[in-house]
Amino acid sequence: QFADVSAKADVANFNNFFATTCAPGEYGDGNDASMNNAPQIQVLNASGIGYTKYYYINDAVDAEENPVPGNCWANQDGFIATNSDALDLAKGFWFKSMTDGTVNCSGQVSATGDRGRTIIADQFNIVANAYPVALSLNSAESTDFTPGEYGDGNDASMNNAPQIQVLNASGVGYTKYYYISDAVDAEENPVSGNCWVNQDGYMATGTQVPVGQSFWVKSASAGTFTFSL
């Protein structure tokens, strides 16, 4: 199944920081079923429409079409991924493998306390936990978002509020959080200001996004989602 993964380091390309023990596929003549069955990464395009795909194969070539020794990440034409295939910090991506294995991310961890992502209006944007620690959504500064309201729980404004969906640990279903202006705490005392809440309107506490996890953000209006640790 697809797993949403995050980059916690400023990286040049997948071959610099993303290693896996999953069995590689082969490019072959470009029509080999092994290519489609190879471990793959999908990165949402900047436009928010479509994905760029990379495959983990054992017969990649470089730009001059010389064979690349060993297994590596390659584009859909079988050429090894290069620095032009850079992945931005805090940008999430999908990973899928037909075989079990482990994945390891390595690289320079960002020393910047604040890290933002631009959110395209009215569609789901994949965002990554950019830090080597679990993330509390209410430690983030969500700017330019128009909050919704919980109201009586049936208010249309709740469903129209900016929302975050985090894939459950089982890989099945999502836990949803909403950005609203009338949250309450566990004792049902009103919370001052806007914050992220669970689906029952209670302020989210603790951590919601594990290390290495990506999540989806959707808002009716464009804005920025800024981490602040």
Report residues per predicted region.
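DUTPase catalytic domain/fold
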Residues: 141-212, 216-219
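A short, polar beta-strand/turn micro-motif
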Residues: 1-37, 45-47, 81-160, 208-229
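Intrinsically disordered, low-complexity proline-rich tandem-repeat tracts
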Residues: 24, 34, 39, 44, ...
